[in-house]
Amino acid sequence: MEDCCMLPYYTAQSSPAMGMFNTSMGKLQRQLYKGEYTIFRYAPMFESDFIQISKRGEVIDVHNRARMVTMGIVRTSPCLTLPDVMLLARPAAVCDNARCGPATQKRESPPAEILELTRLLPLMFVKITIHNSVKKQLHLKLATGRSFYLQLCPPSDASEDLFVHWENLVYILRPPVEAYSDTRAILAGNTLDSSVLEEVQRSPVGYAMKFCEEKEQFRISRLHMNAEMFGSTYCDYTIEI
């Protein structure tokens, strides 16, 4: 039996995100299922590939290559009605032909299959907004105040508009008035106190963080990305292999 057929669906009856997690498995979820991150092995996940862009929508590249990011939204417990964790990963090795141009926004060929998990972020410390719905761009703001921008890079054989799911996610996690980046809504994570931190530590998210920290082969450090766009904090964990 295929591995993907063995994964259960966590379908809380009151969950507005139920349909999102009943999509087919992506490469990050398949990799986590087969790997040693047991905390995420059976967790339902919705994921897509993105390219990192600037606020003006320009592609951020390194050595003439677009910076690919796989973002996964995870529900760590079947008791939860909403997702609670964001995972960010990047290709461990980039294939020569794996590029995503700003004109087509389609991958010419699949990127390397092996992904490197780089971030585990509690969603309560991340604000996701729609930066540009026409260009399928998202704005992610961390509790530290750091921001970065991602543009959806769907597979060439995609049979549906995946950005619709991301738009739905934005509205599920935030009230409509805060859904777009041009509002002046205040990020709740900017006013963190000890009670919030204690709540996180007792939650499945806190267990996941502790699990990742205790694994000997991993160390917590800053993400190897644009220093002006990323920072390190207690709620912004980076896992290096």
Curated annotation (Swiss-Prot):
The organism's place on the tree of life at top rank: Eukaryota
**Which InterPro entries does the UniProt entry name for this protein?**
GARIL-like_Rab2B-bd
Write the signal peptide boundaries.
none
**PANTHER family linked to this entry:** GOLGI-ASSOCIATED RAB2 INTERACTOR PROTEIN 6, PTHR22574
The record's comment on protein family reads: Belongs to the GARIN family.
What is the official name of this protein in its record?
Golgi-associated RAB2 interactor protein 6
User: Which organism is this entry from?
Assistant: Homo sapiens
Question: Which gene is the coding source of this polypeptide chain?
Answer: GARIN6
